[in-house]
Amino acid sequence: MQKFTTFTSIAIPLKRANIDTDAIIPKQFLKSIKRSGFGANLFDEWRYLDHGEIGMDNSKRPLNMDFVLNQPKYQNAKILLVLKNFGCGSSREHAPWALKDYGFKTIIAPSFADIFYNNCFKNGILPIVQNNNVMDELFSSTDKITINLDAQSININNKNYPFEIDIERKTHLINGLDDISLTLQYINDIKAFEKHYFNKYDWL
């Protein structure tokens, strides 16, 4: 997992509440267990005018130009602004995979579904909870936003908005540590235990 560093980006304002994981990545695209390749089908039913299926050439599909992700001014955005209860519905980890593969590094919302919120951290995405007043400020601005995880701040128009984050999760993101890399920190201890265990119980 890549280290999470301070960055500046435009934000995509997706002003909808209760966006569920089936809207984020529809069920027909869940056959793969790879973490890459899902970005092209992020919000598939909203981005395209036809019905998408796995294996389709998305470059030939008709785009819904009214949908915010398809508008040219929001291309290459790394921040997503949404309303309350983002990521509700089924617990599919493909949802953060799709968001990450599209290029999002941070999602800002008044609230998140618990499982989705936890899955974001496991996949290197920073989910930020902000109150409605701050969300209104962010939605109303077209300026770029700076996310400083180390300082726990959102900066826009020379205004800083602090945010809360668990210190352990913050450390993991800053250092690019996922569950596998955390486990590998103890690889020597694991190998020593295995050697001792199988020497002692050599009939296993």
Swiss-Prot record:
GO molecular function list: 3-isopropylmalate dehydratase activity
A single GO BP: L-leucine biosynthetic process
Matching InterPro entries: 3-IsopropMal_deHydase_ssu (IPR004431), Aconitase/3IPM_dehydase_swvl (IPR015928), AconitaseA/IPMdHydase_ssu_swvl (IPR000573), IPMI_Swivel (IPR033940), LeuD (IPR050075)
Reaction equations catalysed: (2R,3S)-3-isopropylmalate = (2S)-2-isopropylmalate
E.C. designation(s): 4.2.1.33
Cellular component GO terms, alphabetical: 3-isopropylmalate dehydratase complex
Family of the protein in this entry: Belongs to the LeuD family. LeuD type 1 subfamily.
Record's subunit section: Heterodimer of LeuC and LeuD.
Protein function: Catalyzes the isomerization between 2-isopropylmalate and 3-isopropylmalate, via the formation of 2-isopropylmaleate.
NCBIfam families for this protein: leuD, PRK01641.1
HAMAP family reported in the protein's UniProt record: LeuD_type1 (MF_01031)
Protein name: 3-isopropylmalate dehydratase small subunit
